[in-house]
């Protein structure tokens, strides 16, 4: 446990950001999994789930969770699955 006041604050903010990032990342992965499942079953709502997953990926990029090229690659793969 840190003794310096600023270090104590950094630990607290790191925990807050870590939990926020974890929930954001989890939501992104969940959206991708839902789309994958819908695309595999040729569900009617696959297009809507694709849009939702794309939004989650873009949001993760803007928050610094993933690299923009990673998001672009994932979106490209999702679009290819949607087209099939």
Swiss-Prot record:
This is Small ribosomal subunit protein bS20. Residues 1-28 are annotated as: Disordered. InterPro entries: Ribosomal_bS20, Ribosomal_bS20_sf. GO terms for cellular component: cytosol; small ribosomal subunit. GO terms for biological process: translation. One of its GO terms (molecular function) is small ribosomal subunit rRNA binding. Binds directly to 16S ribosomal RNA. Gene3D superfamilies: Ribosomal protein S20. Belongs to the bacterial ribosomal protein bS20 family. It holds the Pfam family Ribosomal_S20p. Keywords: Ribonucleoprotein, Ribosomal protein, RNA-binding, rRNA-binding. It comes from Listeria monocytogenes serovar 1/2a (strain ATCC BAA-679 / EGD-e).
């Amino acid at each position: 446990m840190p003794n310096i006041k600023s270090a104590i604050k950094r630990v607290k903010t790191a925990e807050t950001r870590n939990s926020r990032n974890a929930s954001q990342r989890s939501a992104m992965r969940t959206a991708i999994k839902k789309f994958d499942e819908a695309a595999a079953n040729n569900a009617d709502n696959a297009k809507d789930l694709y849009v939702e997953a794309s939004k989650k990926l873009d949001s993760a990029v803007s928050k610094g969770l993933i690299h923009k090229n990673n998001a672009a690659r994932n979106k490209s793969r999702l679009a290819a699955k949607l087209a099939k």
